[in-house]
Curated annotation (Swiss-Prot):
This is tRNA(Ile)-lysidine synthase. The keyword RNA-binding does not apply. It is an enzyme of class 6 (ligase). The keyword S-adenosyl-L-methionine does not apply. Its EC number is 6.3.4.19. It comes from Deinococcus deserti (strain DSM 17065 / CIP 109153 / LMG 22923 / VCD115). One of its GO terms (cellular component) is cytoplasm. It is found in: Cytoplasm.
Length: 533
């Protein structure tokens, strides 16, 4: 019992969100937290994968009531989320589960979230990584952000003995025996065979994870310390693999382990090698340096009038957008297109100016779509919705900013406006409201493939939220010279982040600026009439 309680004593008197499914591990962790005099908040996720899953939710609710613990329960159709996002069910369940735990922590002011992963879970994770050919078998980390996993070294036998000593029952989830799920197959069919020949297999795999985590941390530090032009021929491959991984991730590229191996080996030997990554982006190693291939810019897939010319940019090129006329060079700069690639971007140009810019997605001059029979601009329409929300905010005497989130298919899945004044809360920005609504709609914290459309360039707080949510693209109207995080004050995306969204600025910029200007003029007039406003 001391093995179970010892890591929990530091949390005495503290609010701790604990994920409780009803299974033995999580029920034991809840009981142990109560015994250690912590203040547990029970968070349960009903995955809606079984017809009687609501019975588990009620059972967990009753247990929390008996123990006097706060309780929250959420039902999410995990299978539907998986189908919608292109994930497998196990991955979707994990992502949704941690979002539910994080939400509960925010609601209850908890700085710690605990899960009841045990030595068995760790062993299965390491074995799964080995079978998948993962380069580093680090397994499940004991600490990640606010999440703590105090029982990664605890065998299942100790947990069951603890529950039996308490006379505490638990629930058995039938899906844990469904071998169509990889982890269930490993648990029910593979691990028993290994344990029969190697009785200490769980502890051995757990040791592998712990040592691998220590090694990986040291090697990642060495990789990060490599300067761009330092010779690579004497750098260990283990360090080079991590350096390549860091560079590809910072560029927002997708890849698999074999591609990292090829690039790292080429860096060390000095040979020239080209690798096409997932998604078609090319990477070349020459002279030990990593070079990303230039993008393949899209050409027009439609017919255009005879007086339009297909060419690349020239000095002075301008395009008339719904929000006003802008230099093409400024548009390409806002899109974060590297300087050495801007002269390769195709344009359609008439005597009146640039009509079309060949980036993804295409940028059209005002009225140009109708000339060639193309459908309405999705971003223009979305910005119109955001402007409507900004005007609502202005009427409510809030800072007039509105935002919407477009799902992968282009449908609006979240919207919001500023409510900071009404709520006396400076985190009530339009972007955060729209992101919250979108995550609730999709049932996950990650908005992969989604676009955030906002009338005013985001501040650092809202940009940070978009980065955490893995938003694929940020579109804004007016620049923000007082708090803009995308160039208005500082371009925070110029630093190296794990995920960098594409950025499009200036969409209906004049309309967005007009809403701001009119609102602030009205506010100044009210203050002149009544200084207390």
């Amino acid at each position: 019992m001391s093995t179970l309680l010892a890591p929990l004593h530091p949390y005495a008197g503290r609010v701790v969100v604990v994920g409780v499914s009803g299974g033995a591990d999580s029920v034991a962790l809840l009981r142990a937290l109560v015994q250690a005099e912590a203040r547990p908040v029970v968070a349960h996720l009903d995955h809606a994968l079984r017809p009687n899953s609501a019975e588990d939710a009620q059972w967990v609710h009753d247990l929390a009531e008996q123990l006097g613990a706060a309780h929250t329960s959420t039902r999410v159709d995990v299978a539907a989320v998986a189908a919608r996002r292109g994930w497998n069910v196990e991955d979707a369940a994990r992502r949704v589960r941690y979002e539910v735990l994080s939400r509960a922590a925010r609601q209850h002011g908890a700085h710690t979230v605990m899960t009841a992963h045990t030595r068995r879970d760790q062993a299965e994770t390491v074995l799964m990584g080995l079978l998948r050919g993962e380069a580093v078998l680090t397994g499940i980390p004991a600490v990640r952000g606010r999440v703590r996993r105090p029982w990664l070294d605890v065998p299942r036998s100790e947990i069951e003995a603890y529950l039996k000593a308490l006379g505490q029952e638990w629930r058995e989830d039938p899906t844990n025996a469904d071998v169509t799920y990889t982890r269930a197959w490993l648990r029910t069919e593979v691990m028993p065979v290994l344990a029969a020949r190697f009785p200490g297999v769980e502890a051995a795999l757990g040791r592998v994870a712990k040592l691998a985590q220590q090694d990986d941390e040291a090697l990642r530090d060495l990789a990060a310390a490599l300067t761009p032009h330092a010779p690579r021929d004497r750098v260990p491959l283990a360090v080079l693999r991590r350096r390549v991984t860091q560079e590809l991730k910072s560029a927002g590229l997708q890849f698999h382990v074999g591609q990292v191996d090829q690039l790292a080996e080429a860096q060390r030997t000095g040979e020239t090698r080209h690798v096409t990554l997932l998604g078609g982006r090319g990477v070349t190693v020459t002279g030990g340096a990593l070079h990303l291939a230039a993008r393949a810019w899209p050409l027009p897939s439609f017919s255009w009038p005879e007086d339009w010319t297909l060419r690349t940019r020239q000095p002075g090129d301008r395009i008339t957008l719904p929000g006003g006329t802008r230099k093409v060079s400024d548009v390409l700069t806002d899109l974060k297109i590297p300087r050495d690639q801007r002269d390769d971007v195709p344009l359609l140009v008439s005597a009146q100016g640039v009509k079309w810019i060949g980036v993804e997605p295409n940028i059209w001059a005002k009225g140009a779509r109708a000339v060639v029979g193309q459908p309405a601009d999705l971003l223009d329409t979305a910005m119109g919705e955001a402007l409507g929300l900004a005007r609502e905010a202005a009427l409510a005497q809030e800072v007039p900013v509105g935002a919407v989130v477009l799902g992968p298919g282009g449908r609006i899945i979240g919207s919001g406006r500023n409510t900071s004044r009404a709520d006396s809360d400076m985190t009530r920005h339009a972007e955060l409201a729209a992101l919250r609504a979108a995550t609730a709609e999709l049932g996950t914290a990650y908005l992969t493939g989604c676009t955030l459309v906002v009338t005013l360039e985001p501040c650092p707080m809202c940009l940070g939220a978009a980065l955490e949510a893995r938003v694929e693209r940020i579109v804004y109207g007016a620049s923000n010279p007082k708090a803009g995080a995308l160039g208005g004050v500082s371009d925070l995306l110029s630093s190296h982040w794990g995920h960098v969204p594409a950025v499009t600025g200036g969409v209906r910029a004049q309309d967005a600026a007009r809403v701001l200007r009119d609102s602030f003029q009205e506010l100044r007039q009210r203050r002149l009439k009544s200084p207390d406003v």
